[in-house]
């Protein structure tokens, strides 16, 4: 974590940058302390590069974020700013959150890895989420190793939410193994997909 450049989704408080929730009514909102996971990263040497755009309140009005691979296509949902920054290789990793598909959908659209740990495995304190009873804190990353190591670190350092358990296992991800077999499944609509 020490020296790692990190982006922070604009739903997490940062003491040195405004937390606007992508809403005009919070244009001047400044938190007095970092969110728990931001504090953990900062105190262990991460370089908080800036805030990444989100949908308004993490819900509706999309930000001006563009898909780094095709400007005509969507970058995804609420964590799209984090996904686009990592997908464009501006950052190796960025903090995000998901209640429905806001981590995994943008990662698929912007060609990066998303890791969404179990609910409550990473402390949500200082995050402003539209659905706190369903929102998971997670990350976007350019590599599986960075995604796993950052989530594991946050879970162990910022701690889990009260009543929840931290991520188990080693701080390093398991080694990749060749699968016994692969399956390719064609779902309805596959034939409509351009072959290019």
Features from the language model and the residues they span:
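Gly/Ser-rich catalytic/binding loops embedded in alpha/beta enzyme cores
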Residues: 1-100, 180
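Conserved active-site and cofactor/substrate-binding residues in soluble primary-metabolism enzymes
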Residues: 32-36, 80, 97, 107-110, ...
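A short helix-breaking turn/cap at a secondary-structure junction
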Residues: 116-196
């Amino acid at each position: 974590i020490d020296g790692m450049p990190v982006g922070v989704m604009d739903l997490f408080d940062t003491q040195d940058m405004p937390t606007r929730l992508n809403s005009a009514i919070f244009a001047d909102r400044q938190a007095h302390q970092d969110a728990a996971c931001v504090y953990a990263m900062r105190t262990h040497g991460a370089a908080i590069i800036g805030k990444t755009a989100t949908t308004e309140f993490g819900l509706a009005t999309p930000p001006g974020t563009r898909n780094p691979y095709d400007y005509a296509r969507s970058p995804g949902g609420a964590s799209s700013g984090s996904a686009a920054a990592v997908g464009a290789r501006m950052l190796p990793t960025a903090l995000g959150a998901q209640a429905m598909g806001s981590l995994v959908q943008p990662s698929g659209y912007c060609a990066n890895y998303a890791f969404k740990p179990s609910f409550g495995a990473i402390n949500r304190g200082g995050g402003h989420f539209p659905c706190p009873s369903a929102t998971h804190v997670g990350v976007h990353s350019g590599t599986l190793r960075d995604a796993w190591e950052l989530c594991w670190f946050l879970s162990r350092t910022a701690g889990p939410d009260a009543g929840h358990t931290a991520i188990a296992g080693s701080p390093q991800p398991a080694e990749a193994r060749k699968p016994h077999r692969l399956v390719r499944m064609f779902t309805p609509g596959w034939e409509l997909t351009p072959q290019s």
